[in-house]
Design a protein with these regions (language model features):
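Asp-based, Mg2+/Mn2+-dependent phosphohydrolase catalytic module
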Residues: 74, 78-171
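Electropositive phosphate-/nucleotide-binding environments in soluble metabolic enzymes
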Residues: 6-9, 153
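Metal-dependent phosphoesterase signature
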Residues: 16-52
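N-terminal polybasic phosphate/anion-binding patch
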Residues: 1-5
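Non-catalytic, surface-exposed connector residues within folded enzymatic/regulatory domains
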Residues: 26-30, 47, 71, 98, ...
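An amphipathic alpha-helix signature
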Residues: 8-13, 33, 74, 78, ...
């Protein structure tokens, strides 16, 4: 997705500014966001999990702090993860606002770790940009990262092996 990881509020504001040549009103913003949630929630709740994610969560849960850092609004993100039975794997669930880079920097500060010891896993340019801004490592998932220099894969089936290599290098 070309604009993956950008908050819907930013997308709606851009649409009104660039296409309709005016600023979106607060009422229009709230209406569009509510309509978006209604139309998208069922799809999100019923979407298949990315291959490999459960193996990653089960292997690393309890060994290292795991966080979700997403452009999805906080309350909605928490609800989706709870309803999908995934929230229990995470030390923290961090949605917007603020932006991903600030969320990631905050996680690194909270955990009192060297950013070089943290890994951001993502599927959008905003994820790799956030990792770069926070100076963390990055693993890309999906077609966008096919030709990227970062470690990546079409899914998360190769993530555990890469993480194990990193962990072995830290011992």
């Amino acid at each position: 997705a070309l604009h993956g990881g950008v908050s819907r509020r930013e997308k709606f504001a851009w649409l009104y500014r660039e296409v309709f040549h005016r600023e979106i009103t607060p009422e229009e913003m709230e209406d569009l966001c509510a309509r978006f949630v209604t139309s998208a929630l069922d799809n999100v709740l019923n979407a298949p999990l990315v291959p490999g994610i459960m193996d990653v969560l089960e292997r690393w849960h309890g060994r290292v702090p795991l966080y979700v850092c997403s452009g999805t609004p906080q309350a909605e993100l928490e609800s989706v993860l709870e309803r999908r039975g995934l929230a229990r794997y995470f030390t923290g669930i961090c949605g917007t606002p603020p932006a991903k880079a600030e969320l990631l920097k905050g996680i690194v500060r909270k955990e009192r770790i060297d950013p070089a010891d943290a890994v951001m896993v993502g599927d959008a340019p905003t994820d790799s940009d956030a990792a770069e801004a926070a100076e963390t490592l990055f693993y890309g998932r999906g077609a966008f990262f096919e030709n990227a220099s970062c470690p990546h894969g079409p899914d998360l089936l190769g993530l555990n092996a890469w993480l194990e290599e990193l962990a072995a290098g830290k011992d």
